[in-house]
Amino acid sequence: MESYVKFQTPETLEKAVLDMVENSYKTGKVRKGTNEVVKSIERGESKLVVIAEDVSPAEVVYYLPTLCEERKVPYVYVKKKSDLGLKVGIASAASVSIVDYGKNDDAYKSIVSQINDAKSGKSENKE
């Protein structure tokens, strides 16, 4: 596990997050790439940040979890940047920011709740 990964994401949550990323991408409400993600967080546009665990060098995304915590933006990890990239129409993506999740309000609330559970360690017993 990379040093910037602060908690493990359960597989069911990862799948739900990737589905939401894909649906949000179809509406054009996703920022891809670390620079765009940082801008969306700093502008207060970001609703959810997704960070790949296999980014090399780690410094590319190392500060994103801290920035998200400072700005109170939920964030989550996915195992592979290639999986994340596939959902947003590119080969790989180190990070993605959802700026509008559309009509997926219930799914968004569920994902944020599961992220909070994963951060507090509650999800470890469910796997």
Curated annotation (Swiss-Prot):
Keywords: Cytoplasm, Ribonucleoprotein, Ribosomal protein, RNA-binding, rRNA-binding, tRNA processing
Annotated compartments: Cytoplasm
GO annotations of cellular component type: cytoplasm; ribonucleoprotein complex; ribosome
Keyword rRNA-binding: yes
One MF annotation (Gene Ontology) recorded for this entry: rRNA binding
Gene Ontology biological process: ribosome biogenesis; translation; tRNA 5'-leader removal
Principal location listed in the UniProt entry: cytoplasm
Positions in coiled-coil regions: none
Subunit structure: Part of the 50S ribosomal subunit. Probably part of the RNase P complex.
NCBIfam families membership: eL8_ribo
Protein family (similarity comment): Belongs to the eukaryotic ribosomal protein eL8 family.
Its biological purpose: Multifunctional RNA-binding protein that recognizes the K-turn motif in ribosomal RNA, the RNA component of RNase P, box H/ACA, box C/D and box C'/D' sRNAs.
Official protein name in the record: Large ribosomal subunit protein eL8
Organism: Picrophilus torridus (strain ATCC 700027 / DSM 9790 / JCM 10055 / NBRC 100828 / KAW 2/3)
